[in-house]
Amino acid sequence: MDVSRARSALRGWGGVAVMAVLCALALAFVLLLPYTQQAPDDARQAGQKAVTGTQARADGCVDAEAHERTPAPSGADGPTIDAIKARTGAKRKLIVGVDQNSYRWGYRNPNTDGAQLEGFDIDLVHRIAEDILGDPDAVQFKAIPTNQRIPAIEDGRVDMVVRTMTITCGRLEHVAFSAPYFKTGQQVLAPTSSPITGYDASLAHKKVCTAAGSTALAKLEADRKGGRLPATTDLSTTVPNQLDCLVRLQLGEVDAVVTDGALAASQAAQDPTVELKGAPFTTEYYGVAMKKDAGDLVRRVNRVLVDYRAHGWQTSYDDWLSATLGKDSAASKPPAPQYQRGS
C-alpha cells in the first residue's frame, strides 16, 4: 500500500477520515500477514519432504484449478474465426506456435521427408485446423521458445499456442486458455548416478536448470523463498527453451533439471543416462492458449476437444506417449473439463 501517494491525493477532513481507515487497514494487514503465510512445522523444514500443493492468488484463483475458468464449448463463429477464414490463397491457414524440439510432443522427425513436425501436440493442432478450415494440413507452424509463448499471442504473431503450456492464474491475466487436454506435474530429472532423490533436501548445494518463464522456475523461486526448498539450491541457470536444460545436464553444467514430468519422461527416453527422481510435486494441466478477447476461438477449440477426447486423444497418446508415461498411468486418460458457470 502506497500511503504517501494516498495522502497527497486526499484533502480536507474527509481525506483525513479516509486516511485513518486506510492506515487501520494497513495495520491489520501487517498484523495478520504472519498468520496467513505461516506454514506447518513439517513443511517449514527446508527441503525435508517433497513439496506438494498449489499456490493461491489474490483473486481467489488456484493454479491447479485455473482451468475451470475456461468458457463452455460452442461451434458458433465469431470475429476471430471469421478473420482466420477470411485469409486467402496460401495464407489461408491456422497460425500456431509450437515446439520443434520436444521429443514426442512437438519435434522434427529426421526420418521423414522434410523432417516433418510430429508429436502429441502436433496431432491436436491438425485436428483443430481440420475443424476450423476443413483441412488438417492448413497450418502454418511457428517455432516459439518457451519464454516467448505469451508474447507471441499478445503480439498477434500466432492465432494460438499448442506447446505443453500449463494453465495458471498468472497466465490467465495475459491470455485465454482452452479446457485442459493433458494432466501432468513438475518432476526432477538428474543423472542416474546422481545422489539427488527428488524435490527434497538432496537439492541443497545443487545447480538446477529451468526454462525462463516456466511454471517450474516460478515454483522453485517461491519455494526457496518460503523455506520449502534448501536456500543453497542454485536456480541461476535459465534457458529460453526447456530442451536446452537437458543439454546443460549432459555437459555437466547443472546437476538437475526441473520441468513437467511428461516432458522429462520424453527426455529420459532420449538419454538413458538420466532419469526421473522422485514423484511429481505439483498438479498441472496443459491448455491451448489464445488471445484474451478471442472468446469465439476458445469456445470453438473447446468444442473440438469434446470430440477429440472421445475420438483421437487416446490414439495419439498411445502413439507418442505411452512408451514413456505408461499405458495405465494417471496421465494416460484425458482430464475432464470444467467450465465457467453461465458460459
Region roles according to the model:
Residues 26-49:
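C-terminal region of N-terminal signal peptides and the immediate post-cleavage residues
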Residues 34, 137-201:
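Acidic, polar ligand-binding/catalytic clefts
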Residues 46-51, 182-190, 265, 269-305, ...:
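Periplasmic-binding protein-like
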Residues 54-161:
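Extracytoplasmic small-molecule ligand-binding "clamshell" domains
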Residues 66-78, 215-236, 308-343:
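Ligand-binding clefts/hinges and TM-proximal coupling segments of bilobed small-molecule sensing domains
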Residues 136-145, 231-241, 278:
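Short beta-strand-to-loop elements that line the ligand-binding cleft
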